Amino acid sequence: KPFTEYPYLQQVLTELTKMRQLKDLRREVTLEVHIFSFAYKKGIPMDDSGNGGGYVFDCRGLENPGKYERYKTFTGLDEPVVKFLEDEGGIKKYLANVYDIVDPHVKRFVERKFTHLQVSFGCTGGQHRSVYCARHLADHIPDSNP
C-alpha cells in the first residue's frame, strides 16, 4: 500500500476509486437505441431506463394493409405488406420525416454521452405499419450514425 503512513488518505483514495461516477468515466459510454413496435389498443411501451423520454410515432395515419383480408396473416416484414406500404402506403416519406427527427437526436445523445434513447412506433394492431417502421429505423440508425 503506497500510503501506509497516511491511513486516512489511503482510505479516502480507496473509496474514491469505488465511486460510480468514476466507474462511468472508465467504461466506454455507448448509446443504446431501443426501438419498439406496438398496438395502441395494448398501450405504449414503458421506458424502463429511468429517463422517461424518447419518441412515440403514430403510424395510424398511413394506409393500413390490415384492413385487407389478403394481408391479415402477414407482418410488416413480409414482402406483400412491404410492397403495399412502399407502393400505396406513403411509408417512405413518413420514415424520411422520422429519420430527420431521430438522426440529429442520436448524434446529440452520442456527443453528450447519453446511454439510452427509446423510439416506439404504434399502429392499430402493432403488426404491419409499426413493425415495418421499427425494422427500417433499426436498419437505418447504424448506417447513418457511424
Predicted features by range, described:
Residues 96, 100-103, 131-135, 139:
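A generic structural signal for well-ordered alpha-helical surface patches
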Residues 138-146:
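Post-Walker A helix-loop "phosphate-sensing" segment adjacent to the P-loop in P-loop NTPases
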